[in-house]
């Protein structure tokens, strides 16, 4: 059997490549009918992800521990899966005021692959190793390998290399695959079933992966002190909208008025968490910085330490 025939045969056993019996007539429907089919399938995704909360929680714990030791969260994937990793990574600096080096998205084929497929990139095992070497992967880091099919050579190679370097590896897939599972410490496999359009894993599989990545990054940041109540207390006020959000967050966190919030932000160099602590406790910026540092950046703990 030649290589191509072998791959065709292999695809028969991949869940995401199956033909969905619920959408066999989709080409006969009007626009509303097509959308109803898509919506019905989409509604299955969140409940399936919900069954994986124990595994996702284990992943969060690994990431939190890594952050505490100076490690990074590194997503690696190809195609839609890789793009979703990049999307989650680039949102972390404005949302949580972390360095762009703390959460990294690696996409097979590089930055250009965000906009146009790079032929052969997902099949290139050495490329994944080179990409991880380029960011100086260390044993402190967490690598999340994302592949809907669970078979992408680029991703599996990256996961295997990461484990060889002593890094912990989390797998996020939508089809059970033994070689994939063997290369990760935590296997998060959301089997959402065959797609509305056969093999189009940008649909249910992509939605499931997005939900899981949202959980991994957001929960890890919350557990690292990046929220107060449910407020984005470390938002980076880097544009007019985010500055307005920062003002509003200070007002919500402290129940102060607009002028007080703006004054505190000015004194805190637009650091929302610092400004909030100053308003809540009456500390000046230097004292508030010290209080946050002694409480590892957790605003609630710093407030309680001051007896407020």
UniProtKB/Swiss-Prot annotation:
Protein EC: 4.2.1.126
Catalytic activity annotation: N-acetyl-D-muramate 6-phosphate + H2O = N-acetyl-D-glucosamine 6-phosphate + (R)-lactate
CDD domains: SIS_Etherase (cd05007)
Involved pathway(s): Amino-sugar metabolism; 1,6-anhydro-N-acetylmuramate degradation; Amino-sugar metabolism; N-acetylmuramate degradation; Cell wall biogenesis; peptidoglycan recycling
Chain's gene name: murQ
MF (Gene Ontology): carbohydrate derivative binding; carbon-oxygen lyase activity; ether hydrolase activity
Other observations noted: A lyase-type mechanism (elimination/hydration) is suggested for the cleavage of the lactyl ether bond of MurNAc 6-phosphate, with the formation of an alpha,beta-unsaturated aldehyde intermediate with (E)-stereochemistry, followed by the syn addition of water to give product.
PROSITE patterns (alphabetical): GCKR (PS01272), SIS (PS51464)
Keyword Cell wall biogenesis/degradation: no
PANTHER family (UniProt xref): GLUCOKINASE REGULATORY PROTEIN
Gene3D superfamilies reported in the protein's UniProt record: 1.10.8.1080, Glucose-6-phosphate isomerase like protein, domain 1
Family: Belongs to the GCKR-like family. MurNAc-6-P etherase subfamily.
Subunit note: Homodimer.
Protein name: N-acetylmuramic acid 6-phosphate etherase
Keyword annotations from UniProtKB, A to Z: Carbohydrate metabolism, Lyase
Catalytic residues identified in the record: 91 (proton donor), 122
All residue ranges annotated as the SIS domain in the record: 63-226
Annotated source species: Colwellia psychrerythraea (strain 34H / ATCC BAA-681)
Uppermost EC category: lyase
GO BP, one annotated term: amino sugar catabolic process
Function of the protein: Specifically catalyzes the cleavage of the D-lactyl ether substituent of MurNAc 6-phosphate, producing GlcNAc 6-phosphate and D-lactate. Together with AnmK, is also required for the utilization of anhydro-N-acetylmuramic acid (anhMurNAc) either imported from the medium or derived from its own cell wall murein, and thus plays a role in cell wall recycling.
């Amino acid at each position: 059997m030649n290589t191509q025939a072998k791959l065709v045969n292999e695809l028969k056993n991949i869940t995401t490549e199956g033909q969905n019996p619920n959408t066999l007539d989709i080409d006969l429907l009007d626009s509303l009918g097509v959308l109803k089919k898509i919506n019905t399938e989409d509604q299955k995704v969140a409940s399936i992800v919900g069954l994986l909360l124990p595994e996702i929680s284990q992943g969060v714990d690994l990431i939190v521990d890594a952050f505490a030791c100076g490690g990074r969260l590194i997503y690696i994937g190809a195609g839609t899966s890789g793009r979703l990793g990049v999307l989650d990574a680039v949102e972390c600096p404005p949302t949580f005021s972390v360095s762009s080096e703390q959460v990294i998205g690696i996409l097979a084929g590089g930055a250009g692959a965000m906009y146009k497929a790079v032929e052969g990139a997902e099949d290139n095992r050495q490329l994944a190793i080179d990409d991880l070497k380029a960011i100086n992967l260390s044993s402190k880091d967490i690598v999340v390998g994302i592949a809907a099919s669970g078979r992408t050579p680029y991703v599996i190679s990256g996961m295997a290399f990461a484990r060889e370097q002593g890094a912990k590896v989390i797998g996020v897939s939508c089809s059970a695959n033994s070689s994939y599972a063997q290369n990760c410490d935590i296997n998060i496999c959301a089997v959402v079933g065959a797609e509305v359009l056969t093999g189009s894993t940008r649909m249910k599989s992509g939605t499931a992966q997005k939900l899981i990545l949202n959980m991994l990054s957001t929960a890890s940041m919350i557990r690292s002190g990046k929220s107060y109540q449910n407020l984005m207390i470390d938002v980076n006020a880097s544009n007019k909208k985010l500055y307005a959000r920062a003002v509003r967050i200070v007002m919500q966190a402290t129940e102060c008025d607009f002028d007080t919030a703006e004054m505190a932000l000015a004194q805190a160099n637009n650091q929302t968490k610092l400004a909030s602590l100053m308003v809540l406790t009456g500390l000046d910026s230097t004292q508030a910085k010290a209080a946050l540092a002694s409480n590892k950046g957790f605003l609630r703990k710093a407030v309680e330490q001051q007896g407020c």
